[in-house]
């Protein structure tokens, strides 16, 4: 028994040793397999397919930072700033970072932020809590640097600052309708800002960085330089713009008018030197301003041009040989198609100069009826009526121009004194710039151009010169535009008055007063159009309402630009032969 027990014990010990050895080997094998699997997995992830992990890691740590570039500056023709960008800050929050740090509390620092942003603390918390896992939300835009620095010093978790810019307009309401404005993202919304948005907007740069869990930059990965925006030099002369706006604004207030517009053009280049509207608005703070008040009426509003087209009627009649400059017309009122054609005052006879000076509807209508119906249509079209000026400003209208094959006599007659078509003040300014260049048509420009500017001759120079000379009589004693006269200077103008058209297409008891012309008449340098819409102070004729504004503006322009006076010397006789019939005085 003892021998058997002795042999059994070593056997068990041997079996136990074998078991331990096998188990150890199994364990080692498992470990080796695990290590092999892990090494294989690591090799797979690092060598064969690393993109996913790299992508996930980059999503957690890489950030793209925009390197902003300022919007281009807008200046007048002499470099005076009309729109500039000033540096400001945007305040933004990282909701996730903020919540991870404990969220918004009643701490004095959070109350200070609330006061700085003028936002109640509960509203601030509500905005941040709307998306607790979000990483970006604006709290305030275009914050001035001092306030932004104050907020930065609060050192609030999850609250960050970002560089941006805000547009500032030094001329304010003087150039508001022309320059327009941008939105909070520096995108052009109105005026030149919108029309030239691409030119004024640079290409932002980009910086890719790696951040740690606390948002600190630990590595610069790459960067792309920003491309600077272009500056824009306009044709506008800020001095003349201010002058035009001041006189126009005063006239609108004095005449209790609905609105007014004025456009000043350089005859030799087609450059728009001033374009103003009244009432205006402050582009630096237009909160509460009605959208309707922001439109540039000089390019968007259309009216029947009234008597301002009469010089073109006389030119057409002279060109076609219907009359000569010494012709005397019978201007007694007459009826046509059941309608009476008459003037404000009665004249039995008028020369062509008298027709313009007294603004005779009878005279120009007889000239129109003596010509083919297509004659005036062609002339008006040559001078640009019915065609957009292509100035480049968004919102410009091309007016309304008749497209008729057959015209009744009454339509032909009224067409000669500005009814049956509609134009913008800018289109009318282009007409008079062409008259001022003695029949050379040049495209208008809102940007500065270098002379000489070639043009297209659309009318014989001799005829246009003759009519310009006739137009001088309008501002002389006895003329309908005598209130536009400028001491020391000769001016060639035409006043006009037209009834307004209501929403239903019918004429209403409201009027538009015009005065358009060029100066100095001896060698025209500037063309000016003044439009006063719906004057309510008791007078509505162009000679009484818009003519004084024309004189004030053009006189200021001539003196500002140091144009030498060209008026006739005292005692020198004028060669005008105007009225050979009855009647005195004239209004238009």
Residue positions per predicted region:
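Periplasmic/cell-envelope proteins involved in peptidoglycan metabolism and beta-lactam response
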Residues: 1-286, 374-386, 395, 503-507, ...
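Beta-lactam-recognizing serine transpeptidase/beta-lactamase-like catalytic domain environment
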Residues: 2-7, 11, 83, 211-223, ...
């Amino acid at each position: 028994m003892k021998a058997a027990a002795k042999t059994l014990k070593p056997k068990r010990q041997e079996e136990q040793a074998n078991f331990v050895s096998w188990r150890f080997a199994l364990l080692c094998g498992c470990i080796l397999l695990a290590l092999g699997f892990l090494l294989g997995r690591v090799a797979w992830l690092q060598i064969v397919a690393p993109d996913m992990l790299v992508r996930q890691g980059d999503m957690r740590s890489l950030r793209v930072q925009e390197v902003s570039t300022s919007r281009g500056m807008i200046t007048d023709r002499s470099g005076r700033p009309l729109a500039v960008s000033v540096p400001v800050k945007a305040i933004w929050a990282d909701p996730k970072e903020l919540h991870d740090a404990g969220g918004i509390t009643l701490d004095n620092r959070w109350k200070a932020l609330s006061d700085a942003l003028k936002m109640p603390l509960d509203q601030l918390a509500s905005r941040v809590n709307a998306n607790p896992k979000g990483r970006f939300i604006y709290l305030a835009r275009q914050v001035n640097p001092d306030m932004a620095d104050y907020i930065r010093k609060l050192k609030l978790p999850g609250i960050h600052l970002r560089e941006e810019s805000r547009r500032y307009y030094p001329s304010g309401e003087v150039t508001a309708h022309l320059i327009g404005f941008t939105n909070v993202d520096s995108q052009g919304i109105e005026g030149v800002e919108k029309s030239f948005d691409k030119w004024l907007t640079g290409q932002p740069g980009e910086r890719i960085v790696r951040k740690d869990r606390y948002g600190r930059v630990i590595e610069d990965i790459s960067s792309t330089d920003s491309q600077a925006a272009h500056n824009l030099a306009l044709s506008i002369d800020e001095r003349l713009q201010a002058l035009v706006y001041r006189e126009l604004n005063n006239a609108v207030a004095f005449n209790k008018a609905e609105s007014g517009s004025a456009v000043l053009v350089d005859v030799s280049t087609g450059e728009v030197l001033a374009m103003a509207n009244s009432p205006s608005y402050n582009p630096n703070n237009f909160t509460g301003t009605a959208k309707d008040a922001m439109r540039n009426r000089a390019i968007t509003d259309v009216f029947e041009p009234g008597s301002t087209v009469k010089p073109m009627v006389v030119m057409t009649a002279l060109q076609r040989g219907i009359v000569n400059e010494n012709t005397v017309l019978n201007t007694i009122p007459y009826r046509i198609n059941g309608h009476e054609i008459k003037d404000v005052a009665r004249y039995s006879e008028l020369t062509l100069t008298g027709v313009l000076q007294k603004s005779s509807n009878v005279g120009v209508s007889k000239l129109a009826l003596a010509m083919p119906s297509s004659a005036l249509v062609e002339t008006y079209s040559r001078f640009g009526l019915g065609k957009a000026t292509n100035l480049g400003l968004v919102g410009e209208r091309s007016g309304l121009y008749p497209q008729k094959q057959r015209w009744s006599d009454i339509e032909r007659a009224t067409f000669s004194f500005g009814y049956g078509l509609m134009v913008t003040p800018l289109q009318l300014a282009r007409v008079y710039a062409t008259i001022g260049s003695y029949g050379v048509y040049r495209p208008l420009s809102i940007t500065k151009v270098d002379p000489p500017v070639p043009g297209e001759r659309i009318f014989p120079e001799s005829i246009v010169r003759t009519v310009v000379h006739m137009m001088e009589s309008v501002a002389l004693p006895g003329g309908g535009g005598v209130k536009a006269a400028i001491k020391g200077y000769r001016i060639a103008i035409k006043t006009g008055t037209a009834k307004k058209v209501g929403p239903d297409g019918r004429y209403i008891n409201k009027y538009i007063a015009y005065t358009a012309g060029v100066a100095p008449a001896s060698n025209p340098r500037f063309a000016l159009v003044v439009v006063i819409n719906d004057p309510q102070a008791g007078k509505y004729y162009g000679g009484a309402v818009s003519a004084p504004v024309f004189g004030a503006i053009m006189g200021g322009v001539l003196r500002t630009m140091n144009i030498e006076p060209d008026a006739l010397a005292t005692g020198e006789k004028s060669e005008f032969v105007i009225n050979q019939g009855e009647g005195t005085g004239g209004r238009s």
